[in-house]
Amino acid sequence: MKVMTFNVQHCLDYQNQIIDIPLFADFIKEQNVDICALNEMRGEGNWEGYTDQTNALGDSLSCNRYFAEAIKVVGTNPYGNALLTRYPVKSAETVHIPDPDERTEDVHYEHRCALRAVLDVDGRDVLCVVCHMGLAKSEVAFAVKTVCQILDESTLPAIVMGDFNHTKDSGMLTPLFERLSDADELCERAGIYTFPSYAPREKIDYILYRGFKCESCRVIEKIVSDHFPIVAELTVE
């Protein structure tokens, strides 16, 4: 099966700086993936442009979907992570990540969540986790702990995807790499960067897995969002 992770930045066409859901629907369709993890998605809100992007993409692609709301921008406009998939969704939930008690780092702080879903992949249950981690080290520590708890509570084959906002050598993600393999190890171009798409200089987007064999992995080097997506082909062991 093919899986993709993509920070879509509100479905903002990076080239033209307008919200363009059909552009993203067509791009995702081109990749022909079975599971697609999306970060920075909007839900139906009161502001102009805050529409239900998950259902719009899901309807366009004729696939199952789930939206995990992390926050409401200015109290009325949902924003979070989403999962699109051709497989039946047996269960899905939004797991909120604890916020740090103190905000001492000079970065933007934001409440985060993880999307937890169990999919029926050809008769076998597979755990999927989608997460967009914070910029502050204290935020990432809570996010990593939360995702590890989700993983440790299950024995299912698992895929963890998303924009983690930190590189592998930062050390912040080590507990995840102790539990999971990184599809990047089979990337067609070793060390390929995912951000920013207009001048890539770091890899902060990931497809991690357990209970699978990774057959291939590649970064799609096309400027649609401010991130490049990653696509990997996995087979259940």
Walk through the language-model features, giving the residues of each.
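Generic alpha-helical scaffold signal
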Residues: 18, 47-51
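Short consensus segments that form the blades of beta-propeller domains
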Residues: 46-47, 106
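Active-site neighborhood of divalent metal-dependent phosphoester/pyrophosphate hydrolases
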Residues: 39-46
